[in-house]
Regions:
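A generic structural-conservation signal
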Residues: 54-55, 152, 222, 383, ...
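A helix-coil-helix interface module used to build multimeric assemblies
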Residues: 1-202, 207-211, 275-276, 287, ...
Length: 458
């Protein structure tokens, strides 16, 4: 069958070429944006006197009916069409005759698809941001529940200083909050209308680009027609933001995987978010966390695929750009699923306070506080640091811990030690003394929770 774009050629192509060229299998998900954009375009054409109001009314009514039919399932997308734009125009022309052929006046598929994908990704950005907010709420609620649960803090995966589980969780809440901010910033740049840029050079018709932009909820226009149809940096930026988000989820997943192991036993995952083994009946595998960690690489791959596609393209539109959609659609779909699963996993997670505290009692994570004790009594920090290290070495040799080392052995290193040192190196006291803004004390964590909840309400 001849194509709507048949002009210089007869429009008849081999089936294998049709299949290779077609994008309707994946761009059909943008049917709503395509139809809404066309309705705004028809209204603008009439407002500028390019077509009659009667024709515009027929076009808008016809498009509205197509949208309704697609929504309720009485119309099925024909996957033999080249793309969603051609499908909608074909159905419209079949129903309206020559009036349907007027819709594409002062428009190209180049600006049409750029419009559709901006509108579609605008919605995806909003949905993903809402899902991140739900996850932040789950993390923050869990942090409040465990704001006083002692946990060993790590550097280099070695026990470092005592913190609380609530403090650790709030670190991820802060990261996720920045992910929401990145999406909002990305959306702001994305929300510029390319319609009216036409194929690449603009149009000879007296169009009103602002009319369509305002009607479709855009904040402004793409101010150069070549740029409007030929760049996909807004896709790249969105996928970059999603990659950073997935990096945060992957790090969180890695810790959950470690914490849920028998070697740590810091957390217990709900049976609803774990799986078993086909051969080992004792297993309870953190598959959801592992899949999130694994799917992070998939989203990274989507980003790199699009960057690689775009890097060598001359202006303006090239068919290579059809490859933008599968990558960005896959990234959005993957991220949404990961966020939904992750939120449920966090909501049902239970922490083992006893095991976390037991782990914190090993590894001399109060050694810094021991040094600070001497500093507050007038000793230079580097001297105090050295003495604290010597005492740790002595404890290791004697198979004991700082809290149980007798006072006389402390006095052998410095006469500044007194009985009050045991209070200074008590783990909960070590936590509660860290009152600096953003610190791990219960009061500080509660303030972090308050600030995040306040930000979520903004």
């Amino acid at each position: 069958m001849a194509k709507m774009w048949a002009g210089r050629t007869d429009g008849i192509t081999e089936k294998i070429a049709d299949d290779f060229n077609s994008s309707i299998h994946f761009d059909s998900r943008m049917y709503r944006q395509d139809i809404e954009g066309s309705m705004a375009h028809a209204a603008m054409l009439a407002a500028r006197g390019i077509i009659t109001q009667s024709d515009a009314d027929q076009l808008i009514d016809g498009l509205s009916q197509i949208l309704q039919d697609l929504d309720n399932g009485t119309l099925t997308i024909d996957l033999q069409c080249e793309d969603i734009h051609m499908f909608v125009e074909q159905v419209l022309t079949e129903r309206l005759g020559d009036v349907g052929k007027k819709l594409h006046t002062a428009r190209s598929r180049n600006d049409q698809v750029a419009l559709d994908i901006r509108m579609y990704l605008r919605g995806e950005s909003d949905e993903i941001a809402a899902l991140i907010r739900q996850l932040i709420t789950a993390v923050t609620d869990k942090a409040e529940e465990y704001r006083d649960a002692i946990l060993p803090g790590y550097t280099h995966l070695q026990r470092a200083q005592p913190i609380t589980f609530g403090h650790h969780l709030m670190a991820y809440a802060m990261m996720l909050l920045r992910d929401v901010e990145r999406l909002a910033d990305c959306r702001r740049r994305m929300n510029r209308s390319p319609i009216g840029c036409c194929a690449l050079a603009g149009t000879t018709y007296d169009v009103d680009r602002n009319f369509e932009a305002q009607r479709l909820g855009f904040d402004g226009l793409c101010l150069n027609s070549l740029d409007g149809v030929s760049d996909r940096d807004f896709c790249v930026e969105l996928m970059s933001a999603l990659s950073i988000l997935m990096m945060h989820l992957s790090r969180f997943s890695e810790e959950i995987i470690l914490w849920s192991s028998w070697e740590f036993k810091f957390v217990e995952l709900s049976d609803a978010y774990t799986t078993g083994s086909s051969i080992m009946p004792q297993k309870k595998n953190p598959d959801m966390a592992e899949l999130v960690r694994g799917k992070t690489g998939r989203v990274y791959g989507d980003l790199m695929a699009l960057l690689t596609t775009l890097k060598g393209l001359p202006l303006a539109y090239n068919k290579d750009m059809q490859e933008d959609k599968e990558s960005v659609f896959d990234a959005c779909d993957t991220v949404k699923m990961c966020l939904k699963v992750f939120t449920g996993m966090i909501e049902t997670l239970k922490a083992n306070r006893a095991n976390m505290k037991l782990a914190a009692q090993k590894g001399f994570i109060n050694a810094t506080d021991l040094a600070d004790y001497l500093v507050k009594k007038g000793m230079p920090f580097r001297t105090a640091y050295k003495i604290s290290g010597q005492l740790v070495a002595q404890c290791i040799q004697e198979n004991t811990v700082l809290e149980e080392l007798p006072l006389e052995k402390y006095l052998a290193h410095s006469d500044l030690f007194d009985n009050d040192l045991y209070e200074a190196i008590d783990l909960m006291n070590c936590v509660e003394k860290r009152i600096s803004q953003g610190g791990t004390s219960v009061a500080s964590v509660e303030e972090q929770i308050r600030l995040v909840r306040e930000a979520l309400q903004a």
